[in-house]
Amino acid sequence: MAKIIDARLRDNVHLLGELLGNTIRAQHGDQFFDKIERIRKGAKAARKGSAEGAQLLAETLDSLDESELLPMTRAFNQFLNLANIAEQYHQVRRRAAGEPAPFEIGVFADLIERLKAAGHDNEFIARQVSRLEIELVLTAHPTEVSRRTLIQKYDAIAQQLAARDHTDLSDAERASIELSLQRLIAEVWHTEEIRRNRPTPVEEAKWGFAAIENSLWKAVPNVLRQTDATLHRLTGLHLPLEAAPIRFASWMGGDRDGNPNVTAMVSREVLLTARWVAADLYLREIEGLITALSMREASDELLRQSGDSAEPYRVLLKPLRQRLRATREWARAAIEHGQPAPAEVLQDCAELRRPLELCYRSLHACGMGVIADGALLDCLRRLAVFGLFLVRLDIRQDAARHAAALAEITDYLGLGDYQQWDEQKRLDWLQHELANRRPLLPAHYHPSADTAEVLATCAVIAEAPAASLGSYVISMAHAASDVLAVQLLLKEAGLQRPMRVVPLFETLDDLNNAAPTIDRLLSLPGYRQRLHGPQEVMIGYSDSAKDAGTTAAAWAQYRAQEQLVEVCREHGVELLLFHGRGGTVGRGGGPAHAAILSQPPGSVAGRFRTTEQGEMIRFKFGLPDIAEQNLNLYLAAVLEATLLPPPPPEPGWRETMDRLAAEGVAAYRGVVREHPLFVDYFRQATPELELGRLPLGSRPAKRREGGVESLRAIPWIFAWTQTRLMLPAWLGWEQALHGALQRGEGERLAEMRARWPFFSTRIDMLEMVLAKADADIARRYDERLVQPELLSLGSDLRDRLSQVIEAVLSLTGQSDLLDHSPKTQEAFSLRNTYLDPLHLMQIELLARSRQRQGPAESPLEQALLVSVAGIAAGLRNTG
């Protein structure tokens, strides 16, 4: 294959690999390093079909004694991590003169030009941009495989690569940078990759806050500055100071669904920690502004507040500094001692914003606009986006927990068992109690521990400032009563204001019933008065795909959104769809820009809310420059989906998609649910059980005891990713596409792919995940780990993988997957040289681990866990 990847990227990867080699040699000697090189060269040759290479690889791996397994897995893991750093930096490195800018940089300006060409006037475009409401919800699972300590070192390596890119370096300066890189890589090598203990929910939340502090805090004002400049250049209008087209929310410390470690006290601590972090960040901003705004000239409006002073701006800003210090000190004291807030504590964003806006107006009025539009404007932009609370905390709980709490209450009150009531009886009682002025619970009521925790969570919500909270999400919602149940529990806790209570529909049946459920809800007397803003509905991608396969799940998600748009239109209510996407294709993941543009027409309408998952937060927002690129994509995609939506699909396309979905779900469930040996095969062929020992996040891997249905979507995906079968992302498509092609529907499929963004995006994401799949690697897991009676099932699944690859190639007209993207092909090829040895070592480690069942801290178990992390790094995803 001709070398397509940029020479500078190759140079950085080579340099980092060489420095890692120096570090390994220094600790383990030349002989050990030579084994690494033999394994790498053997893997590279074996990939090209060399029998000698395959033999060299096998012999060298067989020659490793047990003490060498851990450092060997660490070597390949760290090389893949370093390759990721080089790739990530390459995305944002300075471009040489004449080099084309990345797509992400110009996407917003290109869109404005297209909107104008489509007949939209300047005022309309500017107004739509200022009204955009995009909210990215940071979640903790799948939590980063990499430890936060290592992530900080990886970021420092990226900074040194940027420094090395300067063209005017002296030899001494270049040598100094390379010495710094050598030192950082040595620090990485001598730091354990795997946490000894699971993080607590509060630690997860702090990880999320760190992503904001280290990257998004800088990226957001830069993006809004660029957006404003583009808007002004192309329309003559500015983005208003108060505009916040992108905001952030979080599930870290609020998502208690299936996680007993997230309690009411944890959510309270996370809310206070967010206030502390926000106050600390703004304090640094204000101190910088006090230093910068030393000038005397000021408007009469400002002088009326500052009095006669040589430094009027400082007079206005110094009290803000004191109040931010007081807010920060109180937040810490409240976490430790539950101390009430003194009067000096900032409670409302306007208390901080008004003096800053006054300074801004005064500077412009006095001819100092260039000063106003610097750090002061950035601070105002941050304030509009992050507010006083940094992120809005969502609360999530399973509908069954609310029903159980109400059943306990109705039983205590002598009304019977709420859980046994039909839907109409539940609604009648809930409506009556919501309208009743008296409390539901008598003062002497003593709930069980589970019910007390539900009530305590509602009490924390009632006490927290409204602006610190996002939505209350009800997972596994089935009916209108699920929403009213939460509203009643919040009323009982003393909540006096409306809060968004959001049903999450996440199985195939629930997605199909989503629109009728919302229709019934909006028809209930009194419900509209309790509705806070738009009707928010969450679409579950992960669990619906695990339930029905991605073919049927994707179509059910699309149709549910179409129907919800229609229902809300009939009721005259605005709709906000909240997309619960994962990081992987099997959990609804994929490129955000394409995904947004493939939504049904009318479903975006200027609003878009979506989860950003664990490891994807680092890949998409870990470095400020990369965060800027991804935020640009969100802005452009949501604006385009709003003003240039795709046309509705043709009736014939719908019929074809109905058939594909029906055949897909039958094929998927025929294997996953109905094959009697599937669960045994899954547990033997993948490291699913071993993944439960990996301290990934605060949340247990299972909801309850049982088979595949009890597994959370993340370990389900993660396990198949490790073996490279990638089964959840494609199972069902092989039957659906093969059947359609056999029926002579190839032209129809090609037309759908060419003209329907929904279908083309699905096929593109399917192709990407198939390019990561590797039947030969999956076969090796089977041969070493699976009992003989289960081997035929593995063989059948690999045959199905071949079928779906053939179908996709037929549909795309390519000879090989990703022929249209040779750079991506080459990147995968380079990674396989380092992934193949990790897979082979993992297979051996799994076999030995299952024979011995040693303690988690033994070198064997540590090597196994490092292999898991390494494969995740090589494939750029976990679950």
UniProtKB/Swiss-Prot annotation:
Keywords: Carbon dioxide fixation, Lyase, Magnesium. GO terms for molecular function: magnesium ion binding; phosphoenolpyruvate carboxylase activity. The keyword Magnesium applies. Its cofactor is Mg(2+). The gene is ppc. This is Phosphoenolpyruvate carboxylase. GO terms for biological process: carbon fixation; oxaloacetate metabolic process; tricarboxylic acid cycle. It comes from Stutzerimonas stutzeri (strain A1501) (Pseudomonas stutzeri). One of its GO terms (cellular component) is cytosol.
